[in-house]
Amino acid sequence: MKIAILSRDGTLYSCKRLREAAIQRGHLVEILDPLSCYMNINPAASSIHYKGRKLPHFDAVIPRIGTAITFYGTAALRQFEMLGSYPLNESVAIARARDKLRSMQLLARQGIDLPVTGIAHSPDDTSDLIDMVGGAPLVVKLVEGTQGIGVVLAETRQAAESVIDAFRGLNAHILVQEYIKEAQGCDIRCLVVGDEVVAAIERRAKEGDFRSNLHRGGAASVASITPQEREIAIKAARTMALDVAGVDILRANRGPLVMEVNASPGLEGIEKTTGIDIAGKMIRWIERYATTEYCLKTGG
């Protein structure tokens, strides 16, 4: 097969591993910067051009689209889809997952347990917003934040009010969430491919922090997950219509809670921690589903 990887930086670990895994299985691979793709939208002869040339047909596309370029990145991916390329995560699913409010609404509607969460835009009644999620301590986030940026733990009501007021000055959407103290700065990252959790790690925040993101210096170890956690991770990915997802789970006293569903999970931390060839599993999933039937379904 001919496979395109959409990424701004082909030197990143995840891109290199996906390329390596695809080549090992006999596929042709090209890494394309989605921002350098430009599209001819024409009912008679739509096409995608890249750096002065018309791109050939790709059997499959692996989107590694960063949050900062979600709009144009998903637009480029839609064009590949329209031309009959199988996407490892459809554009509409990626856009949905990037909308934190929409994601939580969908997960809640499916009965998937979440931390008690409130979302507001420049709330006038800060006190009521705090009460709505059960009071302090609580976590205050910018809805647009990623990798733990724009996330603050407010341990007292006064601190919570101060943080919310400061965020309100940014004219930003604010997410207020109960703090799961018993998780002790740890979460579980489940890597879902299709209908299977192929790997799971426990991420622990560095000392003095409560954010377990590996990008912020957190540590990782292999996690043994329960059947309930496995079921919830798969259900969360399926709810978001993602073939590949990183599902972050907190272990609370009342049971596992889904924190986030990531549509473009990094592979470095979880592959190096578990030793599992996740990139290879992703390529095998593509081999299974990038079929003539998909092209016929999409008109490709």
From Swiss-Prot:
Broadest EC class assigned to this enzyme: ligase
A GO cellular component entry from the record: cytoplasm
Top-level lineage group: Bacteria
Family according to the record: Belongs to the RimK family.
Cystine pairings recorded for this chain: none
Protein name: Ribosomal protein bS6--L-glutamate ligase
Cofactor: Mg(2+); Mn(2+)
Domain ATP-grasp positions: 104-287
Spans through the membrane: none
Record: residues binding Mg(2+) 1: 248, 260
PANTHER family: RIBOSOMAL PROTEIN BS6--L-GLUTAMATE LIGASE (PTHR21621:SF7), RIBOSOMAL PROTEIN S6 MODIFICATION PROTEIN (PTHR21621)
Keywords per UniProt: ATP-binding, Ligase, Magnesium, Manganese, Metal-binding, Nucleotide-binding, Protein biosynthesis
Binding positions for Mg(2+) 2 per the UniProt entry: 260, 262
Entry's EC annotation: 6.3.2.-
Biological process per Gene Ontology, one example term: translation
Cofactor: how bound: Binds 2 magnesium or manganese ions per subunit.
Binding site for Mn(2+) 1: 248, 260
MF-aspect GO terms: ATP binding; metal ion binding; ribosomal S6-glutamic acid ligase activity
Residues at which Mn(2+) 2 binds: 260, 262
SUPFAM superfamilies according to UniProt: Glutathione synthetase ATP-binding domain-like
InterPro entries associated with the record: ATP-grasp (IPR011761), ATP-grasp_RimK-type (IPR013651), ATP_grasp_subdomain_1 (IPR013815), RimK (IPR023533), Rimk_N (IPR041107), Rp_bS6_RimK/Lys_biosynth_LsyX (IPR004666)
Physiological role: An L-glutamate ligase that catalyzes the ATP-dependent post-translational addition of glutamate residues to the C-terminus of ribosomal protein bS6 (RpsF). Is also able to catalyze the synthesis of poly-alpha-glutamate in vitro, via ATP hydrolysis from unprotected glutamate as substrate. The number of glutamate residues added to either RpsF or to poly-alpha-glutamate changes with pH.
Annotated positions binding ATP: 141, 178-179, 187, 211-213
